[in-house]
Amino acid sequence: MGEALKYSIMDSVRSVVFKESENLEGSCTKIEGYDFNKGVNYAELIKSMVSTGFQASNLGDAIAIVNQMLDWRLSHELPTEDCSEEERDVAYRESVTCKIFLGFTSNLVSSGVRDTVRYLVQHRMVDVVVTTAGGIEEDLIKCLAPTYKGDFSLPGASLRSKGLNRIGNLLVPNDNYCKFENWIIPVFDQMYEEQINEKVLWTPSKVIARLGKEINDETSYLYWAYKNRIPVFCPGLTDGSLGDMLYFHSFKKGDPDNPDLNPGLVIDIVGDIRAMNGEAVHAGLRKTGMIILGGGLPKHHVCNANMMRNGADFAVFINTAQEFDGSDSGARPDEAVSWGKIRGGAKTVKVHCDATIAFPILVAETFAAKSKEFSQIRCQV
């Protein structure tokens, strides 16, 4: 091989290996972690996540997006030509905030995240809540009896013989559900009487509000939702112990052989889909934000409602599901954009993390950090 050819090959190889880079200085965050030589400062440690990389950065982005939800005011937008005089008023525009939808699965209420949810609802930091049947019943049951820490590896057959139910590494004594039945059946009795005598048409959200009223316990997020008039939607109300109780009650008050004559307690789901979609449709001038923990029913129900207004403006998903099986749980925000459930220019992120880890940290750096602002009544348009 001649010298000229050798150098030509080397130049060609070097040009490939050492390809000239685009300059990222100033346009991208530099990756660096927290310096513990500065001592232990948890606020600074959390702030450093955005520059740490991987899911730490996604959590940092989620914190930033939620803070954008909380900071947004209509005054940040220019008035449209057709807006009313009231809508042009500076004070009015400053009072209009982002409408926040919070969705979560039942296991998070089984866990200590229930107390984080209760804090948000207690202080009116969210506007609409969507959960599963377990997310309703577990909140109520915890007012009657505790859930305990167990272990993921405890054998099911042994636990069954002891009357202990396992949720991951949590243990729920079966007696808790007996206490739940003793508490809730008389409430259903009263609701049935109101249905017959006062022609009350119950929807899942009305049932949930009533249960929040009856439990009358400040540790319950449903109690605070009732007190603060925050709607809690659960289209799958029958899927869980709550459904078991409704099933038992249907034999007590209804006539299984003649359901057309006496169906027992009736719950109208159509009324709630109108109410839920209306929360998005009638958001009016407000932007909407979605914070969704876990997947499945709550995730889709919140996203689908926001489709009715051409998509949410902010979205934070926190779950460990993957998109490769085509599940809604695993779908990234961009898939929701294709359906019109999230707007094309929306601020979005998915944090691939157990919500029991990520969500309390997120709340600490967002809602809780701005708690004084929530002492004032948030605008309801």
From Swiss-Prot:
Q: Where is the active site?
A: 341
Q: Which domain of life is it from?
A: Eukaryota
Q: What class of enzyme is it?
A: transferase
Tissue expression = Expressed in open and senescing flowers, but barely detectable in flower buds. Very low in fruits, until they began to soften. Not detectable in cotyledons after 5 days of germination, but reached a peak by day 15 when the chlorophyll levels began to decline.
Q: Which cofactor does it need?
A: NAD(+)
This protein's GO cellular component annotations are:
cytoplasm
- Please name the Gene3D superfamilies in this protein's record: Deoxyhypusine synthase
- Which positions does UniProt annotate for NAD(+) binding? 106-110, 132-134, 138, 239, 295, 320-321, 354-355
Q: Which reaction does it catalyse?
A: [eIF5A protein]-L-lysine + spermidine = [eIF5A protein]-deoxyhypusine + propane-1,3-diamine
Instruction: Give the Enzyme Commission number.
Output: 2.5.1.46
Give a single Pfam family match. DS
Question: Which chain regions cross the lipid bilayer?
Answer: none
**GO molecular function terms here?**
deoxyhypusine synthase activity
Q: Does the keyword Transferase apply?
A: yes
| Description of what induces expression | Up-regulated by osmotic stress and chilling.
Q: Which UniProt keywords apply?
A: Hypusine biosynthesis, NAD, Transferase
InterPro entries, per the entry: Deoxyhypusine_synthase, Deoxyhypusine_synthase_sf, DHS-like_NAD/FAD-binding_dom
Q: In which pathway does it act?
A: Protein modification; eIF5A hypusination
The residues that hold spermidine are 137-138, 244, 300, 326-328, 335-341
Q: Name one GO biological process term.
A: spermidine metabolic process
Tell me, in a sentence or two, what this protein's role is: Catalyzes the NAD-dependent oxidative cleavage of spermidine and the subsequent transfer of the butylamine moiety of spermidine to the epsilon-amino group of a specific lysine residue of the eIF-5A precursor protein to form the intermediate deoxyhypusine residue. Also able to produce homospermidine from putrescine.
**Family designation:** Belongs to the deoxyhypusine synthase family.
What is this protein's record name? Deoxyhypusine synthase
Query: Where does this protein come from, organism-wise?
Result: Solanum lycopersicum
Q: Which gene encodes it?
A: DHS
